[in-house]
């Protein structure tokens, strides 16, 4: 075994190469963990912003395993940190958290679509002008263009809900 320290500003590179990752901001270690946990369980808004792998949207805790967002409705899942019912939080929404469904009644406007090989990343706009990134497998036959409506599967379920 050889211990190696790699310094990079590319989180994909860090996740791919590292057994452990340290997020260092302003000379302080903000999070030190394995890459999976750094990505799925960031411990602060600073880490979320540094990774730039999702957005924070306003939500209200409505139950032990649910919260509500004005644009997306009810979101169910498993909270990483529990908050009292009625708490206003910032929900981390990552591109893989929402699923596309052409038949859904929850429709968002397509602002942009980028091809990334195995998937497309769509940028969707909500009724309150939030811009939400969503991954869709590139084999999906119906590709949406800008200004088209894009269905989001309901109920929305996120395996691990991260809030601040």
Regions found by a protein language model. Give the residues of each.
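Internal alpha/beta loop-helix hairpins
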Residues: 2-73
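Non-catalytic connector elements of ABC transporters
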Residues: 54, 64-164
């Amino acid at each position: 075994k050889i211990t190696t320290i790699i310094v990079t500003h590319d989180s994909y590179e860090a996740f791919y190469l590292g057994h452990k990752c340290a997020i260092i901001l302003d000379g302080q270690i903000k999070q030190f963990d394995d890459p999976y946990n750094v990505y799925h369980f960031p411990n602060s808004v600073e880490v979320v912003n540094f990774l730039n792998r999702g957005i924070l949207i306003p939500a209200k805790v409505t139950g032990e395993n649910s919260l509500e967002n004005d644009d997306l409705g009810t979101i169910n899942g498993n909270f990483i940190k529990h908050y009292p019912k009625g708490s206003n939080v910032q929900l981390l929404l990552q591109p893989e958290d929402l699923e596309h469904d052409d038949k859904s009644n929850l429709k968002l406007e397509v602002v942009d679509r980028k091809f990334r090989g195995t998937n497309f990343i769509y940028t969707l706009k909500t009724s309150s002008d939030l811009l939400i990134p969503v991954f869709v497998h590139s084999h999906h036959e119906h590709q949406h263009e800008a200004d088209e409506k894009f269905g989001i599967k309901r109920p929305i379920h996120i395996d691990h809900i991260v809030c601040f």
